[in-house]
């Protein structure tokens, strides 16, 4: 529309301006408020430019009125016509073309355009419902909002808020992502904001707000959320309930038949930390509920009998039947080998410094005197068996008991297998 008028004005000459007249429709302040247009005049191609009262506003009044131009380039015509003719000035064409580019032109002269939808007006920085909560408000005295402690499950369910009136009945239950109402006055009985800039010292538990269970309801109609002073509601602050807002040890009135074992929340609420940085501290001390056992009861480990274990180990390695019952009396008692062939000979007591290889060689030597059919390879096998037993430990070779050997007790197959 603006481009069409500017093109027409550029094509016209100064001589054409004397023949044509235009009307400008000036609106009063009352009509301007009703129409909602930004400027007090509109341009129509059909009708000439008219003044509303048949005259041009004076230059001094033009700046104070809704007409935005300081200079009036029109000369008043006859009162019967009510028309305003252009003054024949060479600079009027450029001035009018500059004015028309600044006009807000409406095709419908009487009715303004419809307002755009909400999705075009909504800001992307913050939600629409939180943008209404900028103005400060005071707590109402009619109803009390008591937030229920959040029960957060691991599956990601939303916590709920219950609104309890003075009669104690829950009237509203919504999720935490509620859309705030449009009227700011209806928010007076929803929340009360505590001022955190009153003192840097943390307040005692008596100064914090009380917690009322939804089953019992509230007995008084006054608000229990204390506000230390006027504080603006920050829409970017998360609508979460810290421990300071929901617990008060003085207002916790347990029922008569409640015991610490039946209601463990009574003892657990008093030991919670008063921390504002964490949104929910109710799940802090769940680890102590995993295992309950008394500290006085101790389960003693069974004592290990190493003597029986060593006896079993030695019995499994021995070639013959061994007797260990008399070994504990004398630790210096060493292996006594009796000669199996001549029982009248003295028993050879082996000193600790003597090697067990000599013992086994003497054994084989006595055994060879009884049975002369031994071959040389049998001696080597017997010596190898003794060496393997000697490598295990010196204690086993020195602590073995007394065992008699007969000629029939030694079995060659047993020696080869071991």
From Swiss-Prot:
InterPro entries: FAM53. Pfam families: FAM53 (PF15242). GO terms for biological process: protein import into nucleus. The keyword Transcription regulation does not apply. Residues 248-265 have a biased composition (Polar residues). GO terms for cellular component: nucleus. Its main location: nucleus. This is Protein FAM53A. It comes from Gallus gallus. The gene is FAM53A.
């Amino acid at each position: 529309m603006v481009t069409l008028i500017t093109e027409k004005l550029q094509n016209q000459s100064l001589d054409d301006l004397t023949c044509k007249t235009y009307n400008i429709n000036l609106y009063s302040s009352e009509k301007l408020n009703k129409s909602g247009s930004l400027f007090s005049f509109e341009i129509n191609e059909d009708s000439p430019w008219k003044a509303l009262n048949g005259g041009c506003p004076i230059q001094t009044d033009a700046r104070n009125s809704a007409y935005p131009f300081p200079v009036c380039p029109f000369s008043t015509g006859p009162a019967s016509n009510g028309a305003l003719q252009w003054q024949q000035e060479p600079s009027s064409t450029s001035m009018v073309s500059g004015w028309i580019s600044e006009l807000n032109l409406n095709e419908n002269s009487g009715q303004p355009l419809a307002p755009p939808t909400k999705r075009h007006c909504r800001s992307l920085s913050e939600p629409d419902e939180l943008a209404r909560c900028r103005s400060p408000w005071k707590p109402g005295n009619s109803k009390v909002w008591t937030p229920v402690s959040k029960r957060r499950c691991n599956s990601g369910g939303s916590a709920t808020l219950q609104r309890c009136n003075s009669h104690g009945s829950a009237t509203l239950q919504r999720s935490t992502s509620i859309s705030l109402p449009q009227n700011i006055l209806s928010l007076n009985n929803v929340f009360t904001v505590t001022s955190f800039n009153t003192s840097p010292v943390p307040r005692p538990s008596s100064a914090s707000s009380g917690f009322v269970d939804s089953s019992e309801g509230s007995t008084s109609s006054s608000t229990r959320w204390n506000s230390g002073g006027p504080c603006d509601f920050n829409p970017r602050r998360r609508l979460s309930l810290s421990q300071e807002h929901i617990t008060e040890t003085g207002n916790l009135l347990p029922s008569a038949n409640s015991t610490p074992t039946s209601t463990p929340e009574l003892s657990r609420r008093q030991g919670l930390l008063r921390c504002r940085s964490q949104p929910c501290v109710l799940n802090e001390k769940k680890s102590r509920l995993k295992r309950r056992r008394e500290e006085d009861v101790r389960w003693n480990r069974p004592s290990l009998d190493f003597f029986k274990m060593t006896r079993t180990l030695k019995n499994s390695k021995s070639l013959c039947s061994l007797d260990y019952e008399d070994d504990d009396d004398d630790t210096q008692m060493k292996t006594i080998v009796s000669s199996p062939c001549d029982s009248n000979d003295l028993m050879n007591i082996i000193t600790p410094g003597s090697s067990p290889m000599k013992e086994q060689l003497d054994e084989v030597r006595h055994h060879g005197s009884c049975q002369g059919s031994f071959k040389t390879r049998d001696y080597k096998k017997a010596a190898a068996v003794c060496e393997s037993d000697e490598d295990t430990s010196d204690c086993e070779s020195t602590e073995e008991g007394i065992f008699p050997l007969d000629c029939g007790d030694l079995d060659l197959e047993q020696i080869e297998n071991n």
